[in-house]
Each structure stands twice: as structure tokens, then as C-alpha cells.
Regions:
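Cyclophilin-like peptidyl-prolyl cis-trans isomerases
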Residues: 19-200
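Bacterial N-terminal signal peptides
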Residues: 4-19
Length: 200
């Protein structure tokens, strides 16, 4: 085996290890990453500023200004606390400390049919009410959640939610949050975010 071929083979194996083909791997290496630092552990998230530029820029603005400092994971949605929902999902949701900082104006909804991103295990996405109402609240998926994509029925308008990245480390922490004590869907107590900081 020639040296050049060995190098190519090693690159292919590395791509398989990450679940990315070489082109996607190079693209991934260019994307911003942040670390969500919480009182119970860290979650490293890759932000897809290429496919969801508006949503990514909005999230990173809150990060860069330190607005998520002392925020909280406050909601868990799991099998045992959504008895009246026909469409079930599994996520944890977080946001700012509303007594410390205020939201910027809402942003346009970047639909998954346009971005090509899907709500897979570890996807980070923006919480919203109606279309074009997302501000700072975000959630992380536990397991694949196609009901949150465009055309899904978790929100009756069928527009889905704006996925904009994925957790690359710390899903064990996310799952811990999902199973933490809750009153209905509200975590009791909420889990404090120490800060969210850029890694690259």
C-alpha cells in the first residue's frame, strides 16, 4: 500500500468514525462550536451557520453578549408528562434568566425544508409559538424527532422548528436533564446554565 493510499484510507476511516463523508467533515471543521456550561456538566454543540445562517447568528449573538449566563434548563418533555399530546416528543428546553436580560426581537423561521437540517438525536433547535416568533429559547432533541421537522404535527401549523446545529459531546448530560425531577414538564429545580461560550 502506498503512503498516499494509506493517507486516503485513514481519512476515510476518520470520516466513518464521525458519521460524516469527507466533504461534510471539512465543512464541519469550519463551523462554530460552543460549550453549554451547566451546574451538572457540559454540552458541546456545533452551530450550523452554513445551512441555518439566520438562526445561528441569532443564537451566537446571545452567546457572545453573555446573555445565557445564569440561564436555565427549565423544561423536560418525555413519555410520562405529555398525556394529552397526540404527537409525542422527547426534548429538554432552556433559555435566559428573564430577570437579568431581555430578548432581542424575534427572527424569521428557517424551515427544515429550506435548510435541509432534521431533528435528529442531539439536534439543537429554537423553541417558538407561531412562525417567526423565536427569540432565545432553545431545545435539544433526545432521539430522532421528525414531528418537529417541516410537515410534522407537533405544532399544528406544520411549519416545524428551526434546527441549527447538533450536540457533539455531552448527550449523557442532556439525557440526565431529561430524566431529572419535574412538576409536569417544568424541571424542579431548574438546572442552572453557568454560561455558554464559544470554543471556536
Amino acid at each position: 500500500m502506498t503512503f498516499a493510499f494509506r493517507m486516503l484510507a485513514a481519512g476515510a476511516v476518520a470520516g466513518l468514525a464521525t458519521g460524516l463523508i469527507p466533504g461534510e467533515q471539512a465543512e464541519s471543521q469550519q463551523l462554530p462550536r460552543v460549550v453549554i456550561q451547566t451546574e451538572l456538566g457540559d454540552i458541546e454543540v456545533e452551530i450550523d451557520s452554513i445551512h441555518a445562517p439566520v438562526t445561528a447568528a441569532n443564537f451566537l449573538r446571545y452567546v457572545d453578549l453573555g446573555f445565557y449566563r445564569f440561564g436555565r434548563f427549565h423544561r423536560t418533555v418525555r413519555a410520562d408528562n405529555q398525556p394529552n399530546d397526540k404527537v409525542k416528543i422527547t426534548v429538554v428546553q432552556a433559555g435566559l434568566d428573564p430577570y437579568r436580560v431581555k430578548d432581542f426581537p424575534p427572527i424569521p423561521l428557517e424551515r427544515t425544508k429550506d435548510t435541509g437540517l432534521k431533528h435528529k438525536d442531539g439536534t439543537i433547535s429554537m423553541a417558538r409559538d407561531g412562525p417567526n416568533t423565536a427569540t432565545s429559547e432553545f431545545f435539544i432533541c433526545i432521539g430522532d424527532q421528525p414531528a418537529l421537522d417541516y410537515g410534522g404535527k407537533r405544532n399544528p401549523d406544520g411549519q416545524g422548528f428551526a434546527a441549527f446545529g447538533r450536540a457533539v459531546l455531552g448527550m449523557d448530560v442532556v439525557r440526565k436533564f431529561n430524566q431529572a425531577p419535574a412538576e409536569g414538564q417544568q424541571l424542579e429545580p431548574a438546572i442552572r446554565i453557568e454560561n455558554i461560550v464559544r470554543k471556536r
